[in-house]
Amino acid sequence: KKNVAAVTTSVFVKNAKIVIQRLQQIEYIITAWNRKLLQYLNSIYVTPGPMSLYRKDALIRVGGFDEKNLTEDIEIAWRLMRYRYKIKMSLDSKVYTNVPKTLKGWWHQRTRWSIGGLQTTSKYFHLFLNKSFSNLGMFLLPFFSVSYVISILGLFLFSYIIFNWLFGFIYFFIAYYK
């Protein structure tokens, strides 16, 4: 179809041997099905780097990839939607990718994804709740914005719980051995 600018595929973890890789494999499978569902809302928000196909004329029309964005695969998807293109998901095709093997590597990857997502959200925030841009303005931007707020609140809550637990443990330890 003329208005389809990109097609993305299912991404699977290559050689998932350890627990952290197997957990990511489950995450990637769920994400693939989520993308398929989001296709019906014209809201596929990312065209993952391991394997996405683009129409050359559409990429040229929107100005190509933003090389300064940490998550250019999210940014290009949003830009294509801004220009009224559609992105499709093919569950029939699949690609395998390497994922982090350590918690530290996973943390670095997710930090990069979060910062890039914030870059993209701030770049397109002027479309927030803008009906002219359909699901980009009415669904994706509000969803991403709320998810960032919830993530930050969750981080503070988690930190508060850990701090209280540590403080309680130290207080108990001091009181018990005094």
Which residue stretches match the model-derived regions?
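Structural motif
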Residues: 7-10, 90, 98
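Structural detector for helix-capping/boundary residues
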Residues: 56-57, 74, 93
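Catalytic donor-sugar/metal-binding loop of nucleotide-sugar-dependent glycosyltransferases
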Residues: 68, 77-96
